Amino acid sequence: MWLWEDQGGLLGPFSFLLLVLLLVTRSPVNACLLTGSLFVLLRVFSFEPVPSCRALQVLKPRDRISAIAHRGGSHDAPENTLAAIRQAAKNGATGVELDIEFTSDGIPVLMHDNTVDRTTDGTGRLCDLTFEQIRKLNPAANHRLRNDFPDEKIPTLREAVAECLNHNLTIFFDVKGHAHKATEALKKMYMEFPQLYNNSVVCSFLPEVIYKMRQTDRDVITALTHRPWSLSHTGDGKPRYDTFWKHFIFVMMDILLDWSMHNILWYLCGISAFLMQKDFVSPAYLKKWSAKGIQVVGWTVNTFDEKSYYESHLGSSYITDSMVEDCEPHF
């Protein structure tokens, strides 16, 4: 019955869909047939979520709110490095969020951007550089504390996993793209380090990445990441496009994406958590997802007041750029 519960199931979305199809087709029979067909397809191709008891052990270990260091804690140490992982553990983080990218020779490494310009002393697209070339770069070169981390290298995915497990940190693998390559690389990690099944989450803004991960391994805990208006606006709220019509089209796409994320895609992918931009998380929002058996993690929560609100009022886990002080968000 949970499927059709008013707050937690699919009754609302499919009732809305039926109404839209009635308006479009002007035929009750055709609208009902189309709605029913879409529901059957969703049921056939969707994945069952990982058992909630196991997901909770990962998302809220020891039934406590998790503080997750964004990119390893990009304010406290050079982002996506082994030093950041060690520093996050030292500063009391429950887990770390790490970004996966690939070199031109297919080696999975930790990197947020598709170029090395922002974080290192090199230039160029990551997909044009071999692992040997990127290994020579300094990932601390442009960090505010670069003098404290003189010997850092861009780590491989395997090196990062081993370091996290050594410090008993939960890992949030953030996948930006390359659905096939990323899921294959992660599957190898889960096979080599089976403890990851109880110590990690694969998350992405891209539903196809999460769906592919569930296809590859249904035992992996997954999460969708979302920021409303992300297609039409940048992280700091500025419009991405100058022309009215282009902006309007992407606003409409944002509305469709947001509706799909909250009403259909969570069920299709069988996720266990939803990573939401911090400003859109409220008690009512948490209640909505809780009715679906899904945990909400807010990002990026960077001030003492925000952290206190999440811990004391919301009772929700969060991702932060710093475990030790207030800082500006890192987009």
From Swiss-Prot:
Residues 25-247 are lumenal. It catalyses: sn-glycero-3-phospho-1D-myo-inositol + H2O = myo-inositol + sn-glycerol 3-phosphate + H(+); 1-O-(1Z-octadecenyl)-sn-glycero-3-phospho-(N-5Z,8Z,11Z,14Z-eicosatetraenoyl)-ethanolamine + H2O = 1-O-(1Z-octadecenyl)-sn-glycero-3-phosphate + N-(5Z,8Z,11Z,14Z-eicosatetraenoyl)-ethanolamine + H(+); 1-O-(1Z-octadecenyl)-sn-glycero-3-phospho-(N-9Z-octadecenoyl)-ethanolamine + H2O = 1-O-(1Z-octadecenyl)-sn-glycero-3-phosphate + N-(9Z-octadecenoyl) ethanolamine + H(+); 1-O-(1Z-octadecenyl)-sn-glycero-3-phospho-N-hexadecanoyl-ethanolamine + H2O = 1-O-(1Z-octadecenyl)-sn-glycero-3-phosphate + N-hexadecanoylethanolamine + H(+). GO terms for biological process: ethanolamine metabolic process; glycerophospholipid catabolic process; lipid metabolic process; N-acylethanolamine metabolic process; phospholipid metabolic process. Its EC number is 3.1.4.44, 3.1.4.-. Inhibited by EDTA, calcium chloride, and zinc chloride. Enhanced by magnesium chloride. Glycerophosphodiester phosphodiesterase activity can be modulated by G-protein signaling pathways. Residues 1-3, 269-331 are cytoplasmic. N-glycosylated. Glycans are attached at residues 168, 198. It is a multi-pass membrane protein. Widely expressed. It is found in: Cell membrane; Cytoplasmic vesicle membrane. Hydrolyzes the phosphodiester bond of glycerophosphodiesters such as glycerophosphoinositol (GroPIns) and glycerophosphoethanolamine (GroPEth), to yield a glycerol phosphate and an alcohol. Hydrolyzes glycerophospho-N-acylethanolamines to N-acylethanolamines in the brain and participates in bioactive N-acylethanolamine biosynthesis such as anandamide (an endocannabinoid), N-palmitoylethanolamine (an anti-inflammatory), and N-oleoylethanolamine (an anorexic). Interacts with PRAF2. Interacts with RGS16. This is Glycerophosphodiester phosphodiesterase 1. It comes from Homo sapiens (Human). The gene is GDE1.
